[in-house]
Amino acid sequence: SAEGSTNRVHKFDADGNHLLSFGEWGTEPGNFRQPHGLAMDSKGRLFVADRGNDRIQIFDQEGNLLDVWHQFSRLSGIYIDENDVLYGADSESGSVNPDHGDWVRGIRIGSAITGEVEFLIPDPQPDCRGTCTAEGVVADAHGNIFGAEVGPVGGIKRYVRPIK
């Protein structure tokens, strides 16, 4: 589980017993500012959407930092499918927070193995002030991508992944 108030990640076993915790508030690698989502790849690596630091941090099962990626932008939600395709929901870049450089709000799709971003599904309401696009994201085996939206619109939107 990711706990935003203490900026730590906690690991539990299947019976709910606490195994370990790691991280603290900060901007250095291994620290967090609003860990907002978690996902596991096929290798058992833990991907943490560290939204406040505009990055993904990747850890092993013991909480050791393996890598830090910035190319997926400011993620609120993260999902990795059985083929190690990474889906990241950025609900705060662009018109919501112009300080986040040239990032465009939307869902980024790429590789959990190489870190390459392959596609962007832009926010369908790019001029909306506030959080209007997906904060949560998941995909099914048929290529449908679902975004859980918050803000004035709310609800679930379905997107179809572009064919390469």
What is each of the regions a protein language model found here?
Residues 1-164:
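Eukaryotic scaffold repeat domains enriched in small/polar residues
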